Amino acid sequence: MGGGDISHMSPEVKWIFEMAWYGETVRYDGLICEEHPPKLSSDGIWEKLIIKSAGLYFWQYRLPKLEIVILLVFFLWQGFNILFKKLGLSIPKLSSMMLAGLLLNVLVTLSGENSIIADILVTKNRIDVAGCLGSFGFLIFWFLKGVRMDVKRIFKAEAKARVTGVAAVTFPIVVGFLLFNLKSAKNRPLTFQEYDVMLLMESITSFSGIARLLRDLGMNHSSIGRVALSSALVSDIVGLLLLIANVSRSSATLADGLAILTEITLFLVIAFAVVRPIMFKIIKRKGEGRPIEDKYIHGVLVLVCLSCMYWEDLSQFPPLGAFFLGLAIPNGPPIGSALVERLESFNFGIILPLFLTAVMLRTDTTAWKGALTFFSGDDKKFAVASLVLLIFLLKLSVSVIVPYLYKMPLRDSIILALIMSHKGIIELSFYLFSLSLKLVTKDTFSILVLSIVLNSLLIPMAIGFLYDPSKQFICYQKRNLASMKNMGELKTLVCIHRPDHISSMINLLEASYQSEDSPLTCYVLHLVELRGQDVPTLISHKVQKLGVGAGNKYSENVILSFEHFHRSVCSSISIDTFTCIANANHMQDDICWLALDKAVTLIILPFHRTWSLDRTSIVSDVEAIRFLNVNVLKQAPCSVGILIERHLVNKKQEPHESLKVCVIFVGGKDDREALAFAKRMARQENVTLTVLRLLASGKSKDATGWDQMLDTVELRELIKSNNAGMVKEETSTIYLEQEILDGADTSMLLRSMAFDYDLFVVGRTCGENHEATKGIENWCEFEELGVIGDFLASPDFPSKTSVLVVQQQRTVANNN
């Protein structure tokens, strides 16, 4: 064949040669033929060297092309995402993906049809592999949307959320149809089908889109976020019902419409009456806590594909099949969470951006010029842009008015309305489906895409401008131990992550309880990571009997343990148990909200490290718990304590032993808070308190500043007793002073007394900028414990004594 020269070949031979070489070609009669299975990869540089002009470049083969598109899209959308973060803009990830696809569209337009970039991105007369993969990713996105959605929350939603959700959908639709009917048929630039599609899609609020927006903005655990999620859930369900109802109305005949509705009903019956019970049987057979096998995951994915095929045969929106199947899958562990964990990260980061790129590449950007200058443009573009703007304003208005009538602050009502007016990938996909059915024209589709891109960029920026997360937990009162009356009620919030935290928290509560004259109220919060769901949940077990409700299956051990403690140990302590099912990165919001709502004085958190039973080795080190503790310290509306539990005597179980407590006091508000807590413990019969004050060697003890004066006031009683040579038997309190040269002296002193106590209580900032920590502050591993607290909790400390690190309430807002 002359070294690859095929110019002399007849069309028939040339076609056979090309087909044999790279698997697809245009046949001599003009038909496009492919060899199955097709040749996916290039043979490299040899292809061009052997057959020269007949050979393909490596990017023209399907697998290399797919790899190039995936990498190109991934780096572009990640680049936009990083850029927005650097600029401090609150732009969701889906918006970055849209911009990546839009940029590629512009590059293809500018480079021309024959450029390399167009050859890679634009598929002519061949299967669009990247687009097909993106479409599959979009089906998975819809399926996971259904899995994450908890429809039962509609019945638990506040009236404010329910009314807002319904009004946000129905009001724009009603007004839109009234305006459409007021115009004569001759003066309507849009067809009824176009108007119908736009009116419905612009009025609906997508739950998954709002959940993703709030997650990206870090608002899904805020009070506004919770109302928005409930409202969006109601709105989404109402919108889906309207879509299904629209099927019969848009059918050619009433019989056709009823037939389609019957087939949809059959699908729903199979999903909820057959598939869902099977899933529950699988869960029951596998047992709680055991992982789901891969074969079940694969089986569910097959059902997703079959569901979409069924809905496509009905000429309906195929992803709805995946969505309703997802609703039938039990959310949360083990199946729902396993599906989300296995599929979501890869699908959202890699595959779904391909779908958005494919949508953007189908957009005609030249149509935007007429839309942006629609006052002087044609009537149709003016009508499309006007309708989008009108529905947006109607939706925004009603979403502000309804919550405001329910006594929500105006600023919060505006933020909620902006959230409810957000548009994204769901609306984009419906418009693409409408374009494929020729319900809308290419120009109309392009203008609608532009409106969604602008909406997805501007709405989050407006929300970020109005929403100030630092004001979420503003407290207008002092909520700390130092400002409490001696016999005042102590309200604590105890946080539990795992069963091994229960006993240590109970022992500490028992030690800090004085008497019925000085009441103790304890709120117990069991923290459970949100898996396989979108909506965080806070369950109060005071209003929910054991065995009823989803929260009890997670918290049964916690509830029973504290009920036993309440009945058999301290019946006069008031205990209220909660379960918080939330995203690990935002649990601090739920802790602080509960502390603020219940007027808590002290939050007690477990340390992120857990020791073995003999207290000699570390068995777990969970960074997520440490991250949570650090964030609670930053934004708590009250004082916070971190308990490093290694050995804490239970006085009821060991009545012959006393609990020996030592406070390391250097000075400052955190040390005063630690002393106030320890003084409360010292009023117990079996508690012995030692207060060790560390003084800088050679410096005067006289108060020279406000902090020092406050320290002196707190220690006055103890100093007086010590100077008189007394130890008060009724309080069993000892006061000691020790002069320290530097951190080495402090280290030696603490090591010498390591085995004398059961519990050390220190302030978080104990010894900060003081001679007591000079030389050892650089060795601090955990900043949340402070220098002294970190030293006492370190594995190098000789004894395995428990440590409580206390931070006083940081800020109290001015009433003005």
Swiss-Prot record:
The chain crosses the membrane at residues 64-84, 97-117, 127-147, 163-183, 197-214, 227-247, 255-275, 297-317, 343-363, 382-402, 413-433, 447-467. Pfam families: CHX17_2nd, CHX17_C, Na_H_Exchanger. Belongs to the monovalent cation:proton antiporter 2 (CPA2) transporter (TC 2.A.37) family. CHX (TC 2.A.37.4) subfamily. One of its GO terms (cellular component) is membrane. Gene3D superfamilies: 1.20.1530.20, 3.40.50.12370. May operate as a cation/H(+) antiporter. This is Cation/H(+) antiporter 8. PANTHER family: CATION/H + ANTIPORTER, CATION_H(+) ANTIPORTER 5-RELATED. It comes from the Eukaryota. GO terms for molecular function: antiporter activity. InterPro entries: Cation/H_exchanger_TM, CPA2_transporter, Na+/solute_symporter_sf. It is a multi-pass membrane protein. Keywords: Antiport, Ion transport, Membrane, Potassium, Potassium transport, Transmembrane, Transmembrane helix, Transport. The gene is CHX8. It is found in: Membrane. GO terms for biological process: potassium ion transport; proton transmembrane transport. Signal peptide: none annotated. It comes from Arabidopsis thaliana (Mouse-ear cress). Specifically expressed in pollen.
